[in-house]
UniProtKB/Swiss-Prot annotation:
Single GO BP term: negative regulation of mitotic nuclear division
Gene that this polypeptide is encoded by: Tom1l2
Record lineage: Eukaryota, Metazoa, Chordata, Craniata, Vertebrata
Protein name: TOM1-like protein 2
Keyword presence, Phosphoprotein: yes
Sequence ranges assigned to domain GAT in this UniProt record: 219-307
Source species, domain of life: Eukaryota
Matching SUPFAM superfamilies: ENTH/VHS domain (SSF48464), GAT-like domain (SSF89009)
Organism per entry: Mus musculus
UniProt keyword terms in alphabetical order: Phosphoprotein, Protein transport, Transport
Residues carrying Phosphothreonine: 164
InterPro entries assigned to the protein according to its UniProt record, in alphabetical order: ENTH_VHS, GAT_dom, GAT_sf, TOM1, TOM1L2_VHS_dom, VHS_dom
Length: 507
């Protein structure tokens, strides 16, 4: 395509744009920028040549100094050129293939470049929303918002309007206009002295009550420039601090200094805006406009920093509350833990010991529920303390401290069991369990009976009859088996202690 159309920088507007976006420039050359706007407005091919040159400079360029200068030229041309240039800029193809690609993650541009591109797309979408033939940028803007792209906050009062007001001088026919490069040699930036068009001065001047122009002498201009250097220094320091500081992790002294710089720079901007509309010196006005743009950019970055910082503080506060509740709910068995100390605070009477409760048990009851009902009500933590106390004494020690004169005066679980065994004057015999009866029943008449897989209905009926006969020979489950070696005379005297022991062990 470049072979067919030629080098984009070979045209008159392309040559000016190449010089205005040279990376060796220390700052924007507003003289060249305004000359580019004049060529676009006065020539037939000016808008197309300018778009081609801007695409060449912006596409795939990793020199972000040149990219920033090209974006400034593009913004200036949109503000000072007419509908022919707006049609090419607001085109969906130009926005998507040039500007959106600059901020793609694979290019990883600096934050200042991302903010500049997003601010341009947002401003153009707001300005061209009501124009049916300029809605390409509006569609791109809506798509980026749906994808979660966060646009910088724009101070609409401080920004210049996009649509250029009507010229005070009638616009000449572009076809009848002879390019300036053909009639006279192009002068350099240092000797260029033609004033900018009326539209530029009208756009940049805010709607303030102007009492009259100020004609400053050389001494006043020198003093004003020294003050502007101070403003630039404050702006640079503020920008570097915003680059280094992380929202939510900043130092208190750095944050206080940043807020003080913000207040100072805003007061300075108010004075600069007043001077822009009143100073008649063109060079001073350009410097004031440049400083004002720098202030607006750093203010946008500061507002974004404050939003991130406030969001982080709210998130940290919610996380702090959650962690505090979680720590209170955890079980801590340390010496100073509230979970261990708090249940003992305010206790008026010591809990009854396990020995005293076991001494009051009615061991003559026939059921476990009756034995359990004789226990006193106690709290779970009291039962834990009593269990810990009983673990401290061995079985032998408890037997030494027990007197067997009164069965109700026993001092522990082991003593109560020993006392009951001595009173019964018999050694308890193990009670056969229900599982033993079931095993005997299963072994009855089934030792040699192996079932095969293929069983007829007659064999199955026979098997059921054998099972029924075996079930009739099995004794009832509650009664002990007949082969138990227990004398019949001692059955009645042995039954009661055995059930009492079972009830006690069930506890």
């Amino acid at each position: 395509m470049e072979f067919l159309l030629g080098n984009p920088f070979s045209t008159p507007v392309g040559q000016c744009l190449e010089k205005a976006t040279d990376g060796s420039l220390q700052s924007e050359d507003w003289t060249l920028n305004m000359e580019i706007c004049d060529i676009i407005n006065e020539t037939e091919e000016g808008p197309k040549d300018a778009i081609r040159a801007l695409k060449k400079r912006l596409s795939g360029n990793r020199n972000y100094r040149e990219v920033m200068l090209a974006l400034t030229v593009l913004e200036t041309c949109v503000k000072n050129c007419g509908h022919r240039f707006h049609l090419l800029v607001a085109n969906r193809d130009f926005i998507d293939s040039v500007l959106v690609k600059i901020i793609s993650p694979k290019n990883n541009p600096p934050t200042i470049v991302q903010d500049k591109v997003l601010a341009l797309i947002q401003a153009w979408a707001d300005a061209f929303r009501s124009s049916p033939d300029l809605t390409g940028v509006v569609h791109i803007y809506e798509e980026l918002k749906r994808r979660g792209i966060e646009f910088p906050m724009a101070d609409l009062d401080a920004l210049s309007p996009i649509h250029t007001p009507q010229r005070s001088v009638p616009e000449m026919d572009p076809a009848a206009t002879i390019p300036r490069s053909q009639t006279q040699p192009r002068t350099t930036a240092g000797t260029y002295s033609s004033p900018p068009p009326a539209s530029y001065s009208t756009l940049q001047a805010p709607a303030l009550s102007v009492t009259g122009p100020i004609t400053a002498n050389s001494e006043q201009i020198a003093r004003l420039r020294s003050e502007l250097d101070i403003v630039r220094g404050n702006t640079k320091v503020m920008s570097e601090m915003l680059t280094e500081m992380v929202p939510g992790q900043e130092d208190s002294s750095d944050l206080e200094l940043l807020q003080e710089l913000n207040r100072t720079c805003r007061a300075m901007q108010h004075r600069i805006v007043e001077l822009i509309s009143r100073v008649s010196n063109e060079e001073v006005t350009e410097e004031l406009l440049h400083v004002n743009d720098d202030l607006n950019n750093v203010f946008l970055r500061y507002e974004r920093f404050e939003r991130y910082r406030s969001g982080r503080s709210v998130q940290n506060a919610s996380n702090g509350v959650l962690s505090e509740v979680t720590e209170d709910n955890l079980i801590d068995l340390g010496p100073g833990s509230p979970a261990v100390v708090s249940p003992m605070v305010g206790s008026t009477a010591p809990p009854s010991s396990l020995s005293s409760q076991l001494a009051g048990l009615d061991l003559g009851t026939e059921s476990v529920s009756g034995t359990l009902s004789s226990l006193q009500q106690c709290k779970p933590q009291d039962g834990f303390d009593m269990f810990a106390q009983t673990r401290g004494n061995s079985l032998a020690e408890q037997r030494k401290t027990v007197t067997y004169e009164d069965p109700q005066a026993v001092g522990g679980l082991a003593s109560a069991l020993d006392n009951r065994k001595q009173n019964s004057e018999m050694i308890p015999v193990a009670q056969p369990s229900v599982m033993d009866d079931i095993e005997v029943w299963l072994r009855t008449d089934l030792k040699g009976d192996d079932l095969e897989e293929g069983v007829t209905s007659e064999e199955f009926d026979k098997f059921l009859e054998e099972r029924a006969k075996a079930a009739e020979t099995v004794p009832d489950l509650p009664s002990p088996p007949t082969e138990a070696p227990a004398p019949a005379s001692n059955t009645s005297t042995r039954k009661k202690p055995e059930r009492s022991d079972d009830a006690l062990f069930a506890l």
